[in-house]
Amino acid sequence: MKRKDIVKLSRRDFERAWLESGKSLRKPHHDMQYPRLRFETGKSHVLYDTIWMIREAYLRLGFSEMVNPLLIDEEHIYRQFGPEAPAVLDRCFYLGGLPRPDIGLGTGRIQMIEDMGIDVSDEKLENLKEVFRSYKKGDLSGDDLVLEVSNALEVESHDGLRVLERVFPEIRDLKPVSGRTTLRSHMTSGWFISLQNIHDRYRMPLKLFSIDRCFRREQKEDSSHLMTYHSASCVVVDHEVPLDVGKAVAEGLLEHLGFSRFRFRPDEKKSKYYIPGTQTEVYAYHPLLKEWVEVATFGLYSPIALSMYGIDQEVMNLGVGVERVAMILNQASDVREMVYPQIYGEWRLSDRDIAEMLRINLHPVTSDGRMLMEKIVKTWRAHADAPSPCSFEVYSGEFLGRRIEVSALEVEENTRLLGPAVWNTVYIHDGNILGVPPGTELDSELITRARKEGLNTGITYMEALAAEAAYRIEEMVVSGAEEVEVRSTIARSLSDLNLTLEDTAMRYITGKNREIDLRGPLFSTIRCRLRG
């Protein structure tokens, strides 16, 4: 009954109309059925989730956010660390750059340019010399060198590039030279520079925080060390700042992250930018982990280091390693795997992921085709165990503008219309794709587990084979053929069942030594003939 007829009927007989509305439901296209149909949200990275939580905690504690300098001249390391500076600089990355060489234009080079088929006039030579002078002085960036050389010689960019490669190889062979600028290895380097500029511009106390990258030249990266990490650092600046401020800030910050109960222990490292005896490690107890873990360090900046920047206030600094906290909160054992799961992490596809990538290959595309598919399934279900030889009419009538006659048959003697495997349903369990029969008599251990714990894809062998038969009949009618017979015998692989699996899932199953076991006897035959 059509929708408008149901609405009309409801005015006379609501109950009957309501029941009829249930009959109007059509089975959706295979790709619009669960678990193929899936609505997913984007996934955030655990590291940035942790940064956001720490950032929110600082803001709730009344701290204002700041971005500290990332590029630090080595002079600041000496001012902050004193005689300890060389050891600190050993773990710093120095920035290097390519030098700007003097590039001469001798007779030999001019001849080489002319040999490349480029006309060289006095004006062009003068323009080229000016380009190289600007490059040497730094007025011209390396990005624009090819373009400017091409303009000077009045040639296309690809010819200008050939000139640079063949005539001026010294540009290609340049080696980087290090300067005095380092990448920030710890947030303290940036805090001293920032506080130097603002300590006398605001009312005390100052409560500031910064969450940003630091870089440390570790001997190697391992499960607990990366060469770049995030520091969630804060400072409290006032005329007088007791060490207990660090304890209170640590407590307020870490309680927001789910930690409870805190222990404070003197840090044995004793960095020279802290007042002796103030550098303190913070240990916190996490109820979910049920253990004590080190999560932060704080201390009071040394008046000697502060005096190097003209700062006469007292400063408490607390630092939290974001990766460390993220590992604790997510119970990760390897920081590389946590930060770079795409490189170090184990490749995992859930059964749900695989189910989304498994689908019927050939599926009817028209409403007539989908109707015929349902009739094939209905006929098979009704007569699957009929003794052969046998034949049953599936449909006789109009189909895509032509009259057809469709039958389900088995011509061999002493068998049945269908093989027993047609009743199987496809399950996915622990990465294995399995054909699970309706009965339990022949279950293997793997099939038993799949039946209890696996994901039912909703795909039956019968429906997959019926979909292919209906699709082939659509093809027959559209192409003008007179007859088609679709027969399936033994299922050994996905293609035997008219199923397809995306390459990603296939690589995963193969790489993880999982199984695709869909074997079974099918022996189904559908025949279609045109009738005018």
Swiss-Prot record:
Classification via Pfam families = SepRS_C, tRNA-synt_2d
Binding positions (substrate): 186-188, 231-233, 273-274, 317
Keywords, A to Z, come to: Aminoacyl-tRNA synthetase, ATP-binding, Ligase, Nucleotide-binding, Protein biosynthesis
Q: What class of enzyme is it?
A: ligase
Name the InterPro entries for this protein.
aa-tRNA-synth_II, aa-tRNA-synth_II/BPL/LPL, O-Pseryl-tRNA(Cys)_ligase, Phenylalanyl-tRNA_Synthase, SepRS_C
Which molecular function terms from Gene Ontology are attached? ATP binding; phosphoserine-tRNA(Cys) ligase activity; tRNA binding
Task: Write down the chemical reaction(s) this protein catalyses.
Answer: tRNA(Cys) + O-phospho-L-serine + ATP = O-phospho-L-seryl-tRNA(Cys) + AMP + diphosphate
What GO terms in the biological process aspect are recorded for it? translation; tRNA aminoacylation
Q: What is its EC number?
A: 6.1.1.27
The UniProt entry's sequence similarity note says: Belongs to the class-II aminoacyl-tRNA synthetase family. O-phosphoseryl-tRNA(Cys) synthetase subfamily.
Summary of the function given for this chain in its UniProt record: Catalyzes the attachment of O-phosphoserine (Sep) to tRNA(Cys).
What binding partners and quaternary form does the record give? Homotetramer. Interacts with SepCysS.
Q: What is this protein called?
A: O-phosphoserine--tRNA(Cys) ligase
